[in-house]
């Protein structure tokens, strides 16, 4: 009986300590915050150098969903921008024949002043976030007139 009592007391004290120790070990290995730079660029994917427009800065973040087969008309941007593909795939091209393909988890710097298009390719809609550093009142996308 005495052995059983000692065993029960030892187990009653040791098991919670083991459980607490395990939790502390697990939480100590998890970073409270992880910062990962997805893209840093001084020029766009097609080689455009960036120039910030003059005026009152206006930052914009767009969430774009493009159904399979959707293709933008030819256009250009007057401001620097970056894009992040969440799902689906994009194929983009310029008038001078430069091309880009981007899929889930990929980022790219958008062209500035170069006429281009982008198309949602594949069987699922493309979900893309685009951040732009423009000027208040300025259009983010300017249609190309031939």
Feature locations, PLM:
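Short acidic-glycine-tyrosine-enriched beta hairpin
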Residues: 66, 96-113
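Histidine-centered metal-chelating micro-motifs
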Residues: 71-73, 91, 106-108, 112-119
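Glycine- and acidic-residue-biased ligand/ion/polar-headgroup-sensing regions
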Residues: 77-96
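Hydrophobic core
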Residues: 9, 13-17
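A short, N-terminal "cap"/entry segment at the start of jelly-roll beta-barrel domains
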Residues: 4-5, 17-60, 109, 143-146
């Amino acid at each position: 009986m005495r052995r059983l009592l000692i065993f029960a007391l030892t187990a009653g004290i040791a098991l919670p300590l083991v459980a607490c120790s395990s939790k502390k070990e697990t939480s100590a290995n998890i970073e409270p915050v992880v910062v990962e730079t997805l893209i840093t660029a001084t020029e766009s994917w097609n080689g455009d150098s960036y120039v910030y427009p003059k005026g009152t800065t206006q930052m914009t973040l767009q969430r774009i969903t493009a159904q399979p087969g959707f293709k933008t008309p030819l256009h250009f941007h007057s401001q620097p921008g970056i894009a992040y593909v969440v799902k689906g795939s994009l194929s983009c091209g310029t008038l001078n024949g430069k091309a880009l393909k981007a899929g889930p988890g990929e980022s790219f710097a958008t062209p500035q002043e170069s006429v281009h298009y982008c198309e949602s390719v594949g069987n699922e809609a493309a979900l893309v976030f685009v951040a732009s550093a423009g000027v208040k009142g300025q259009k983010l996308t300017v249609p190309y007139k031939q």
